[in-house]
């Protein structure tokens, strides 16, 4: 198996939660045809391959597909590269240029909501209803189930269900889905997802959304 690092992205304030991410820091060691097999073997929601750290060129894989954009891999990779002294101010997945920066313990990226297409959001009446959902809920296609914890404060409870047949029945923390929800609501959010993850969003008038969270070595 190729050398890789595991970090947890969008960890909670107590260090719990966080979505595991596989990082292959030297993507040149894994040829294109072997990447999908490695992503499936690792079994994380996503694995990211760094093709050129200086230019920020990256390749994001789920266990079964290539993604043009995903939030948690880019937040996690931005943090890891800075920790290694190889930080890039811009990451370049296939979707486009993604600025990155650090504010204290929070790593941020900025992306366009349109890049997160295919993730449907559904509002529930209460946090209890979201928490009671089966894994996964009936149906097909990506579902981001959410309810207000505190609407005035912009606090949301959410769970993410890929429902794509690749073994990931529930996503612990989904940056792209949180970005989609923030864009739909047109407001900044604090999203509590999974068993202890926290995702931060900040909306801008030009259609971009900032996505941030804590990252720790997994």
Model-derived segments and their meaning:
Residues 1-218:
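Active-site proximal loop and beta-alpha junction motif in alpha/beta enzyme cores
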